[in-house]
Amino acid sequence: AEIENNRLGINFRFQNSFAPGWLFQASGQTRAFWKDDYEYKANGNNFDAESRINELFVQRSFDQHSIKFGRQTVVWGETVGNSVLDVINHFEFRDFTIIDIEDARLNQWMVVWDYFGEESNWSSFINLYPEFNPAGVRGSPFFFEPTFNFTDYQRDGEVLVEVGTQWKKSFDLSDISFMAAYLYDNQMRFEDPLSGFGDAIGKKNDFILLGFSANRAIGRLLLNFDLAFSHDVLADSFNFPGTSALASPLNLKKDRIGTSFGFEWAIDNEQSVSLGIQAQQLIDEREGLLPGQQLVYEGVYGSWLVRYANNLLN
């Protein structure tokens, strides 16, 4: 696979306060893929384009309350782009390049209620139709040729719901938040079809998330910190048919502790630099493993992200 190198993108947003206390908002994006881009090659060396609607919601505000219904995202955590708490929205893994994280998050059908109190705020959500990470796009760095086709989760009339709430308090130069949620792993676990041919079988997993986040402003510097405890996450959710082996455990649930921290530094009114470091570890990671079995991630694992931004708009 190759990094994309020849594409054109357009993002758009529409917002209309059509009545007192009412707001309609929609956003979307269009991508065109030209010669030498991997999407162009994956399309048989032909021009290709795609479009999608991101946000599409109606908001009602009254007194100290705000209620939004429609396709939207809910973002938790202070560490921009690399937070252990930013797991509510499913993602489209496509490119290695640095993009706005909003381009990777996929919106879902939600009801979001916000309460703005005098000393603290509450925010709660209900995801009415939880979705899962789509399979990698053919030709992209995250794509591999699977033994069996990956399909969407077969709900068969099953009702899936995600819920969560957050309490936030602001001080003179800092904020703190506590949060709790019942979620489904964004990444499904896939199993071989029982017949040995056809489509892979997607398996879901639900878990509980408890979190804490804080930030502190010091002049032009903003320090941030996130902490997450996840109960009953899958130890290995990236075992795909044809890539896993007997040495890999199946359907093994674990508790996980994770933290992310970093800073954002405003160089001036147009330029900024940010750093985010993420680290996670499974609790009692060897418990439940058979002799010879091992996890894809053992010990402490994580990632880091550095960003430089220059806003050229006046």
Give each language-model segment a name.
Residues 2-8, 49-54, 105-109, 159-163, ...:
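Residues that define the transmembrane beta-barrel architecture of outer-membrane proteins
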Residues 102-185:
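Aromatic- and glycine-enriched pocket-lining scaffold segments that form the walls
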Residues 1, 30-34, 62-64, 73-75, ...:
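Transmembrane beta-strands of outer-membrane beta-barrel pores
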Residues 215-314:
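Detector for outer-membrane/organellar transmembrane beta-barrel domains
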Residues 20, 24-26, 67, 122-124, ...:
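Transmembrane beta-strands of outer-membrane beta-barrel proteins
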Residues 15-140:
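Outer membrane beta-barrel
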Residues 10-16, 55-60, 111-115, 165-169, ...:
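Residues on the lipid-exposed face of transmembrane beta-strands in outer-membrane beta-barrel proteins
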Residues 1, 40-46, 95-99, 148-153, ...:
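Extracellular loop and loop/strand-boundary signature of outer-membrane beta-barrel proteins
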